């Protein structure tokens, strides 16, 4: 239906890459933007995105941060008078977006307190017809366990799983992988990163469960 959504915006130096890609797709308006959580590798370029594109609605977890990067994003939202909504998960939470696509918010689960910023990540499941994609941000084992305990298991099965936290070993538990049961997995990771992502344990788990990954 021509509707657009952007989830996260990398470090600030990658804004030209984001802008070039969106322009190549003919995108001038982003109907929905999601900032999964306030770490700079997810919102570093977000202020520039807000400044340079029309945005219909902006979602982020209700977990303020004190960094200059976060403050720039909030200031840009205020300057552009963008409608901002909390990303709060439940079995019925959804983003009003494309009428042909269901965009469910699974986490952070309403009423739960999270200490680690990674675990407040907005976990988004998009479904269109028989195809679905789960975007878990940096949600680690704790957040995944809470989702599994608080939400119906029917919320999780997805055709494609973006592996949480760039393939960190503390963010892809067997129960979560089995609940999602993806046909394939995608790992978003910088080559030669300082953290050793993706961790070999995660790759071994995916292979053991018969989940191809890219």
What are these model-derived regions, one by one?
Residues 1-214:
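Non-globular, low-confidence helical/coil segments that flank catalytic cores
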